[in-house]
Design a protein with these regions (language model features):
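Glycine-centered, phosphate/nucleic-acid-interacting loop/turn motifs that mediate DNA/RNA or nucleotide
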Residues: 79
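Short helix-coil-helix linker/hinge
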Residues: 32-40, 99
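Amphipathic alpha-helical dimerization/coiled-coil segments
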Residues: 4-27, 96-126
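Short capping segments at the starts of secondary-structure elements
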Residues: 38, 49-53
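A short acidic, leucine-rich amphipathic alpha-helix
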Residues: 56-60
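Pre-recognition alpha-helix immediately N-terminal to the DNA-recognition helix
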Residues: 41-45
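Short, Lys/Arg-rich nucleic-acid/phosphate-binding segment
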Residues: 37, 85-91
């Protein structure tokens, strides 16, 4: 998933720059460079507002439940969302890692020419 870097200089800053560069690349691929990227972005934008379970997301986005599950599992695999519980209907929320670096989402949206407000209007709001 993410590369591991040796710190030859002992500088933590170097590690953070490389980590953020990798995170930005991952976001560009997940949100713009692969099929379903726009759906994943809409899911992230909704979860940024409040935690939601897959059924709620499917209803708001007007898509199949399995479609939402597929995208949530992918986002979870890359550490961008977390599930509150293991059970059915458990809510998902934005991970701390992504919450702290939400500016990268905005950067990626700018790179891809996506307007956050327009996406929320198209995808619906809870």
């Amino acid at each position: 998933m993410l590369k591991t870097y040796k710190l030859l200089t002992g500088s933590v800053t170097y590690l953070m720059v490389e980590y953020e560069r990798d995170l930005k690349k991952i976001l560009i691929w997940l949100l713009g460079g692969s099929r379903g990227g726009l759906m994943r972005l809409k899911i992230l934008l909704l979860l940024k507002k409040r935690p939601m379970n897959p059924n709620q997301l499917a209803r708001v986005l007007n898509v199949n439940y399995r479609t939402v599950i597929y995208h949530l599992e992918l986002l979870e695999r890359y550490g961008l969302v977390n599930k509150l519980d293991i059970g059915y209907g458990a809510p998902y929320f934005i991970s701390d890692k992504l919450e702290k670096r939400w500016d990268l989402i905005r950067d990626v949206m700018r790179i891809l020419g996506i307007n956050e407000r327009e996406e929320m209007e198209e995808g619906g709001e809870p």
